[in-house]
């Protein structure tokens, strides 16, 4: 099955069918990163940073995961998972999500007031994000120090 085919893009697949650009993806989360109460109340945004599902081994992904309501939280599985793409390392109070096959990474970080969007042109073989995406996230945080 070719997830990069135009026919697949037109299929409107809910869980994996988001088609956008990186700037728009980051812009979507900007009000949450700024946490000014514009889109959601400050209390609701604060709740998005709190873990409510943390698994030692996720039944689908087969490695540890950490989720809030609707978002992924920091997941550093480098010492627990063999292979590339088993981690999503973001700030302590940041929340976001990755795309299927390592195709995207987005997060909002209310501590730094930064939103981040990254997209690839094609799907890869990673579970969460690819090394390039993680390097960009790491460099973003270094620039904020």
Predicted segments with their positions:
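Catalytic loop of the DD-peptidase/beta-lactamase superfamily, centered on the K-T-G motif
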Residues: 1-145
